[in-house]
């Protein structure tokens, strides 16, 4: 398939400590890159010596991490306030969506984590406005930090059912059913696909 005709997948990835989310996103991107043009939008700290295949485009947002003992978000660039950092990130997102016709958006871990809810919802809503035919996919690992069926879990289901087309769960349901860690699983009304575990 000629690269000009390839559909374009944008993958939003954010990690605040550890790089598991990024590794999973990168491996999925590799598996898709033969048939799609894949762009990774990375909001975590840049990873030194990480080899990105030339067929995958990596866009580095101004990085944000957080202290392990709190939910305080901190820009990697100490000269930026957190608000300024988010504003710069938003400008980059807008620029990408205005320049590139995105066919599929994949969000890593969202909406099962809400630290970057405003940013991801902004991305989703703007993309829906620009391209109503865009498809939306949530990519999530086998276990999540659920709130035992609380209002937070209800909001996760509401966002999935309102904005998304597919939930990809990266596990084997015979080994680790998703409802083990997410009690509201039956409230998810969109298509669900167990992909098996993602490995390097």
Name each region found by the language model.
Residues 75-118:
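Conserved nucleotide-sugar donor-binding subdomain of glycosyltransferases
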Residues 118-124, 151-155:
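Charged helix-capping and loop-helix junction motifs
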Residues 3-18, 106-109:
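Nucleotide-activated donor-dependent transferases that construct or modify glycoconjugates
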Residues 21-32:
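Short amphipathic alpha-helix
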Residues 5-11, 31, 35-84, 90:
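Conserved nucleotide-sugar phosphate-binding/catalytic loop shared by glycosyltransferases and other
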Residues 104, 124-142:
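Active-site proximal beta-strand in glycosyltransferases
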Residues 139-200:
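A nucleotide-sugar donor-handling region in carbohydrate enzymes
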């Amino acid at each position: 398939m000629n690269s000009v005709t390839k559909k374009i997948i944008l993958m939003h990835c954010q990690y605040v400590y550890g790089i598991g989310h990024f590794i999973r996103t990168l491996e999925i991107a590799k598996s898709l890159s033969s048939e799609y043009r894949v762009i990774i939008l990375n909001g975590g700290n840049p990873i030194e010596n990480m080899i990105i295949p030339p067929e995958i485009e990596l866009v580095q947002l101004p990085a944000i991490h957080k202290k392990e003992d709190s939910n305080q978000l901190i820009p990697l660039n100490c000269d930026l306030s957190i608000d300024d950092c988010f504003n710069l990130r938003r400008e980059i997102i807008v620029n990408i969506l205005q320049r590139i016709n995105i066919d599929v958006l994949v969000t890593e871990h969202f909406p099962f984590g809400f630290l970057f809810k405003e940013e991801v919802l902004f991305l989703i809503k703007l993309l829906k406005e620009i391209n109503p035919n865009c498809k939306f996919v949530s990519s999530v690992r086998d276990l999540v930090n659920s709130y035992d069926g609380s209002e937070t879990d209800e909001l996760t289901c509401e966002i999935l059912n309102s904005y998304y087309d597919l939930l990809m769960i990266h596990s084997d349901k015979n080994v680790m059913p998703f409802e083990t860690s997410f009690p509201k699983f039956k409230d998810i009304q969109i298509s669900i696909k167990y992909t098996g575990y993602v490995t390097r």
